[in-house]
Amino acid sequence: MMDSTGMGCWGEERVLRLLQKRGWQLVSQRWSCRYGELDLVVEKQQRVLVVEVKSRRSRGLDHWGLCAFNKGKQLRLMRAIGCWLATHPYFAEHSLELVMALVPLPPSQNTLDWIRIDDLDIDAAD
């Protein structure tokens, strides 16, 4: 049985492999600053995709962990993205999207769900 760190790493690798098969290039993985960590940052055709990966084995009420993605978490994530952009100025002119990849466990399940996080306003997080 995997611990939570193992589940998270496994989920990130699964999502990364899928994105790479679709032509996305890895820019950063587990990039961190004082505001938090960005699980995956990938790029394709002037688009940057920041991916928050949630791996869960539970099928309870909040089996995706969406309740943990509250306003405070969103604000920290926006600030972390702002820090990432400050250290990666090459990508400042790219379009930027934030998505959550929902990875079910056990690994035998083949489906991934994606949630696009709208209203990505980096300036509001300053």
UniProtKB/Swiss-Prot annotation:
HAMAP family: UPF0102. InterPro entries: Restrct_endonuc-II-like, tRNA_endonuc-like_dom_sf, UPF0102_YraN-like. Disulfide bonds: none annotated. It holds the Pfam family UPF0102. This is UPF0102 protein PMT_0624. Coiled coil: none annotated. One of its GO terms (molecular function) is nucleic acid binding.
